[in-house]
Amino acid sequence: MRLVQLSRHSIAFPSPEGALREPNGLLALGGDLSPARLLMAYQRGIFPWFSPGDPILWWSPDPRAVLWPESLHISRSMKRFHKRSPYRVTMNYAFGQVIEGCASDREEGTWITRGVVKAYHRLHELGHAHSIEVWREDELVGGMYGVAQGTLFCGESMFSRMENASKTALLVFCDEFIRHGGKLIDCQVLNDHTASLGACEIPRRDYLNYLNQMRLGRLPNNFWVPRCLFSPQE
């Protein structure tokens, strides 16, 4: 196993099975964040993650963190909160604001550089990256974004500026995703937050098998059309 230097003249990636064990999943460096390369990466179970000032690093960890949307864990207190939720939830209304929110709401710093923002905004314009927004009246207070691969959604980041805002985004999205044929959410690497929401780890080989099947699936043609998903009760 060795770290592969990507060429700017080819969007090809090495097999994820060749990723390093330490650090877990590091596969390649270099290349660029062009739409074609990003889409090729997601189709192969690879994602970019790097610190500002570092070269672009590409990862495919083993095991892989995933969330089966029907297994989303919602605490009793969150269920009570959601019944009286003050939030309105929309899809694809404000992708730029959501990714900016994810970039700025990280006290410990962020990997979401200006180049990353620009790259994913371009994916959004092409219909591949999508956002869920949570509003308190007219103020954006939370949200999440990711990349669609058929009936699999690759979650990238979320943010919250008010109580339970990001959890509300995920809860409402999971419900809508399931109802329209969505199968799986990729969480990349397990952490305490995603584990508390019901995410689990599966072998990379299993994830790649799911990906290869699900990316060929289809959600309804109008699933990603900008729309309101949830409104507070009057």
Swiss-Prot record:
Annotated GO MF terms: leucyl-tRNA--protein transferase activity
Gene3D superfamilies: Leucyl/phenylalanyl-tRNA-protein transferase, C-terminal domain, Leucyl/phenylalanyl-tRNA-protein transferase, N-terminal domain
Domain of life of the native organism: Bacteria
Subcellular location: Cytoplasm
Catalytic activity annotation: N-terminal L-lysyl-[protein] + L-leucyl-tRNA(Leu) = N-terminal L-leucyl-L-lysyl-[protein] + tRNA(Leu) + H(+); N-terminal L-arginyl-[protein] + L-leucyl-tRNA(Leu) = N-terminal L-leucyl-L-arginyl-[protein] + tRNA(Leu) + H(+); L-phenylalanyl-tRNA(Phe) + an N-terminal L-alpha-aminoacyl-[protein] = an N-terminal L-phenylalanyl-L-alpha-aminoacyl-[protein] + tRNA(Phe)
Main location: cytoplasm
The protein's Enzyme Commission number: 2.3.2.6
Protein name: Leucyl/phenylalanyl-tRNA--protein transferase
Species for this entry: Escherichia coli O81 (strain ED1a)
The organism's taxonomic lineage, starting at the top: Bacteria, Pseudomonadati, Pseudomonadota, Gammaproteobacteria, Enterobacterales
Gene name as annotated: aat
